[in-house]
Amino acid sequence: MGKYFGTDGFRGEAGITLTADHAYKVGRFLGWYYNALRERNGDTDPARIVIGKDTRRSSYMFEYSLVAGLTASGADAYLLHVTTTPSVAYIARVDDFDCGIMISASHNPYYDNGIKLIDCYGEKMPEETLLLVEDYIDGKLHVFNKDWPELPFAHREHIGCTVDYVAGRNRYMGYLISLGIYSFKGVKVGLDCANGSSWNIAKSVFDALGADTYVINNKPNGLNINNNAGSTHIEGLQKFVVEKGLDVGFAYDGDADRCLCVDEKGNVITGDHILYIYGCYMKERGKLLTNTVVTTVMSNFGLYKAFDEQGIGYAKTAVGDKYVYEYMAKNGCRIGGEQSGHIIFSKYASTGDGILTSLKMMEVMLAKKKPMSELAAPLKIYPQVLENVRVTDKKAAQNDPAVQEAVSKVAEALGDTGRILVRESGTEPVVRVMVEAPDHDTCQKYVDEVVNVICEKGYKV
């Protein structure tokens, strides 16, 4: 991770740690850089960069700032307006854009925002390009064998254009609809749009496929995105599904790159359930290439036990859909994701896509003629206790011999009945201690043992 860009973009509180000036500079660099790459390849046409945003009040400010920077550098800016992160990735890839930009802080509260950069393949922008952006922001850019204390401005007819590109968002919606291989007619579906990016897309897609669609949290006002809504506050959808007697519910986050489900009984279907359900579905049809589902180290122990019973292999990556996709692309895997609901179907998308995930879950229900509760039933989620310990030095705490010995003792005691995971937070001075076991008391006992050692060694703040 760099100074500004983490695993999921440049994120911070709008106007404090992420400002309009930052956005302008990101636009200035990207517009200039992609024009320069074109010129080096003998292409005199201006760079084309597509931009989407979520519903936060500050997203409009950042959109205008990015457009100012891009056009000042001579690039053309194409505006999808309010849309989802996966739609930007899709359009960047299929419409031959130099890159894509999504303005969103995903599941964070309204006062945060972020800038996610996407390359021309619809994938997260390479680290080396992000480092160049950061160097320009800090006034120390060196690229093309030269220092660039300032970038040239475009002038006259070379100033970039701004293009209303809502047609791109509509094209993405058409693509999603085309993936629906069964009619949804007669199925009562609940959608929680988190007052975010999916509010003007998800219902239209489900309606087009014939569902009886009921929606909550689809009235964004700039301040209510993720506010007791969406996949991080799924209790609202649970209640809605039960009260309305719906067949299934789907909850998205602020930029709709993740999805969690609610079955007809009001139970939460996590990302681990989704991986299990679709992994089994693909294996039954002989389409689970490499016989592997890609997970992260945070997936539940019960998922791996269930995969073992089904004869399905699995891989574990670091936390972050970026790492999941990297493994999938390198090893030819078709499905992977996170417990949080970032699910990647590599045949159809290059990033997690919440609406696509919900369509795929509908496909399994309709193909197997089973309710969601029955599809999820074989997966037994193990009780989990997770404690975040704020420490003075997270690396020293995790690598301390006494801490490692305590972790080893717990792992030995659990054997094949559970697991312990101790890892550093990527963004905070925190060590996370997590235990999964057959019962909650066992989890708590072993978490306490490790946390006590961290405290005894003087690391806890």
Regions found by a protein language model. Name each.
Residues V248, R285-V461:
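Phosphate-binding and adjacent anionic-ligand microenvironments
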